Amino acid sequence: QAAVGRPAGKYTFARGREAGGEVFNIVLYFQAKDEVRTFVIEYLVLDAVRLHTDVAELYWQFIGRNRSVDTEFMSVSLQLPPGAQAEEVRLWGHGPLRGEVRKISGEKLWWETPFLPRDRYLEGRVVFPPRLTPQAKVLTGRAALGSILAEEQRWADQRAAEQKQALYVLAASVVCTLLGW
């Protein structure tokens, strides 16, 4: 049995606001002891695309931080509307350093991480031709690709610096171990 009022195999869903944005919280109720559990959560997102004059943009946090448990493996599959060539679509992932981002086609995109600590998030950003979402309701009236590319480059540079620093710490640890310090 799960906790009182929280039957195993059920879930709750709530909408809220956090840090200036809308948040969707799903709480899954389950029991597990020395076992692996897999959860598949599928949902359709409406009105999440921002339509700029030069690109359409989807920027979405797939799973937030501050969960009660770590996630051993997480993957996200995103299906864009048909009509774009792969070279017209750009995508990025934000979250753990070990994550992977793949463009399978102009329509199918994939994010994956082998381990997501409870205090880390996984989000994705995609830009694609505006013609794919002519019905988008969030219109910015400005060009955005240049600023998006610049922002993503800054984050990539920051990530590279973090990886380099982690490598230096690892190398120093190995040297200290070899020297018996």
Please name every model-derived segment:
Residues R125-F128:
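Structured, non-catalytic alpha/beta "coupling" segments that mediate domain-domain communication
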Residues Q1-G16, I41:
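Alpha-helical transmembrane helix bundles of large polytopic membrane transport and channel proteins
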